[in-house]
Amino acid sequence: MASLLAEPMERLGARVVGIDASERNIGVARAHAEASGLAIDYRAATAEALASAGEHFDIVLAMEVVEHVADLGAFLGACCALMKPGGMMIVATLNRTPQSFAFAILGAELLLRWLPLGTHDWRRFLRPSELAAELRRRGARVAELVGVRYSPLTDRFALGADLSVNYMALVELA
């Protein structure tokens, strides 16, 4: 959903454009932002549409979305086209490992019901090397990788070296 990081980024002083292909999701995000006193430019659009319109941004955030898009290459190509020269993109996604199957599918969907069943298809998760290869084909490179871990005991996320479940990639144009 478009508001995953849009509201926190706006609160930190960024000028935010939040997009989602779903008009319904954008409506929910707009209502929440307005109730919070935030003026976020939410649009029911795709990255491909924004790139075709010639839009450019200092930072592009693709958070927990690449494992859901129909055409990964087209999506990443559009995201790269949206980056201004010297800009960056952050991609957050799930690695395709036995650990990610255990935590994201069995744990989050089946046992804990944090997500609706079928939200994820493990076969669509991307190994960091696969993401890097897709980005290279689009004139970009992964500058840094960092793992993301969630602790249910503290209800907090932490960054680290373990890429086995969730990870983020800092992407720059090559």
Role assignments for model-derived ranges:
Residues S100-L110:
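Short, flexible, mixed-charge acidic loops at enzyme active sites
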Residues M1-S100, P128-L131, A169-L173:
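Conserved SAM-binding loop
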Residues W122-L145:
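Short alpha-helix
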Residues V148-A158:
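Class I S-adenosyl-L-methionine
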Residues A140, R156-A174:
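Core SAM-dependent methyltransferase catalytic element
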Residues T93, L110-E130:
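Acceptor-substrate binding/catalytic loop of class I
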Residues D20, V146-G147:
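Residue-level recognition of beta-strand->loop/alpha-helix junctions
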Residues H32-L38, L106-G107, F157-A161:
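Short low-complexity, flexible loop/linker segments enriched in glycine and/or proline
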